[in-house]
C-alpha cells in the first residue's frame, strides 16, 4: 500500500505543477515541471521506485523488476488517481482546466513520434540510472530523470503537447472534458505514444545490459 500511496502523491504533485504553470502561461513551465518530478523522485524513490508514469512502470515491468501484473496495475491506477485529483485541484485553485494537445501546425504523426521518442528517452534514463545494478546508490538519478523532462518539454512540447506520460495526458484531459472545455480526441495519443516509447526503452535496456556482469 505504501508504494501505491507514494505513486499517488508523486504523480499528484507532478500534474499539479503542470497545471499551475501551464494555466499561468509560464515560459519556464518545463523547468518547473522537471524540477517537480526531480524532488518527488527523491521523496519516493526508496519506497516505490518513483515511477509516476504508467509508461515508466511498463518499462520496469518488462525488465522483470516488478513482482506481478497486479502490482503494475496497482501502480497505474494510483498514478491515474493522482493525476485526476491534481487536475481537479488545479481547477479549484487556478479556476481553469487544462489539457495537453498537439501544436496547431503539428501533424498527428509528428506529435505521436515526439511522444514515442521522448518517452523512450525518459524510460531509458530511468532504467539506466535508477534500475540498473551498475548505478545503484548514486545520488544523481533524480536530477537526470527530471532534466530529461525539461529537455523533452522545451524541445517537443510545442509539437505534441509534451505529456510523455499517460497520467499527465489522462487526468487533465478527463477533467477538461468533464468541465466542458474539450473532448477526448487526443487521449489515445498520450497512451499509445508513451507506452510504445516505454516498451522500446525496455528492449534497448535489455540490449545494453546483455553480457554485462
Predicted ranges, named:
Residues 1-213:
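Membrane-interface helix-loop junctions and terminal tails of multi-pass membrane proteins
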Amino acid at each position: 500500500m505504501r508504494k501505491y500511496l507514494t505513486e499517488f502523491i508523486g504523480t499528484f504533485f507532478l500534474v499539479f505543477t503542470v497545471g499551475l504553470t501551464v494555466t499561468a502561461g509560464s515560459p519556464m513551465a518545463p523547468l518547473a515541471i522537471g524540477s517537480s518530478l526531480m524532488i518527488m523522485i527523491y521523496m519516493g524513490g526508496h519506497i516505490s521506485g518513483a515511477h509516476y508514469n504508467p509508461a515508466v512502470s511498463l518499462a520496469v515491468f518488462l525488465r522483470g523488476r516488478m513482482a506481478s501484473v497486479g502490482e503494475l496495475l496497482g501502480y497505474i491506477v494510483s498514478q491515474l488517481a493522482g493525476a485526476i485529483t491534481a487536475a481537479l485541484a488545479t481547477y479549484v485553485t487556478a479556476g481553469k482546466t487544462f489539457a495537453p494537445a498537439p501544436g496547431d501546425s503539428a501533424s498527428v504523426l509528428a506529435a505521436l513520434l515526439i511522444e514515442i521518442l521522448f518517452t523512450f528517452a525518459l524510460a531509458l534514463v530511468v532504467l539506466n540510472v535508477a534500475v540498473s545494478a551498475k548505478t545503484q546508490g548514486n545520488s544523481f538519478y533524480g536530477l537526470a530523470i527530471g532534466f530529461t523532462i525539461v529537455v523533452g518539454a522545451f524541445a517537443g512540447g510545442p509539437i505534441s503537447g509534451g505529456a510523455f506520460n499517460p497520467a499527465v495526458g489522462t487526468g487533465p484531459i478527463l477533467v477538461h472534458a468533464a468541465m466542458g472545455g474539450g473532448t477526448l480526441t487526443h487521449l489515445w495519443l498520450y497512451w499509445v505514444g508513451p507506452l510504445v516509447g516505454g516498451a522500446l526503452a525496455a528492449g534497448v535496456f535489455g540490449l545494453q545490459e546483455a553480457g554485462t556482469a
